[in-house]
């Protein structure tokens, strides 16, 4: 008899905990993930740096969460972002360098573009789900600002095709390396864009 009551009590407790957990999960947290090229672990005040003031990011870290055991997937930008987006180790991810795709010549040496009809990097494999798609599937509105480098214009992997609602930045990261970029890209669901456009 006592065993039955114990199991019944455990079942009620688990049901209550489950209902409480469900209630607390109804409100999704806002997620802002900041990834920067060439930034070291100790370059922000929230990680102990005291020479340069970084109050806004420090405040975000204080109100949110900090990664204290996160490491870059690669020492260069496109593969590092690809490692984060796909959840794959750099050795398993197709994006392994900052190769540029340009027009009909698949790979262009860095900086040799004379005109910019189609530019970008190696596309993420459309068979692999990436972070923005996971977020969309879980009811989030998604935005990305800065370097995409997960495909070239018109490829199978541009922000509009990979779960991003609002994008403003560079499809081709080469443009981000110029003091005066030739163009920026935008995809805005709220503005009625149906594909990535140049602005």
Residue ranges and their predicted role:
Residues 2, 8-13, 20-199:
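Formylglycine-dependent sulfatase
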């Amino acid at each position: 008899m006592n065993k039955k009551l114990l199991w019944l009590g455990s079942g009620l407790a688990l049901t209550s905990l489950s209902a409480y957990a469900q209630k607390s999960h109804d409100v999704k947290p806002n997620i802002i993930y900041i990834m920067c090229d060439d930034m070291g672990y100790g370059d922000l005040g929230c990680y102990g740096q005291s020479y340069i003031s970084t109050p806004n990011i420090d405040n975000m870290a204080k109100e949110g969460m900090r990664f204290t055991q996160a490491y870059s997937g690669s020492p260069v930008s496109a593969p590092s972002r690809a490692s984060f987006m796909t959840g794959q180790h750099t050795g398993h991810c197709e994006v392994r360098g900052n190769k540029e795709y340009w027009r009909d010549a698949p790979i262009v040496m860095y900086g040799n573009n004379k005109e910019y009809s189609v530019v970008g990097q190696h596309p993420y494999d459309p068979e692999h789900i990436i972070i923005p798609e996971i977020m969309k599937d879980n009811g989030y509105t998604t935005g990305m600002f800065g370097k995409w480098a997960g495909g070239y214009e018109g490829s199978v992997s541009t922000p509009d095709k990979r779960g991003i609602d609002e994008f403003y930045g560079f499809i081709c990261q080469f443009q981000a390396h110029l003091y005066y970029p030739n163009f920026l890209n935008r995809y805005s669901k709220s503005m009625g864009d149906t594909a990535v456009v140049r602005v």
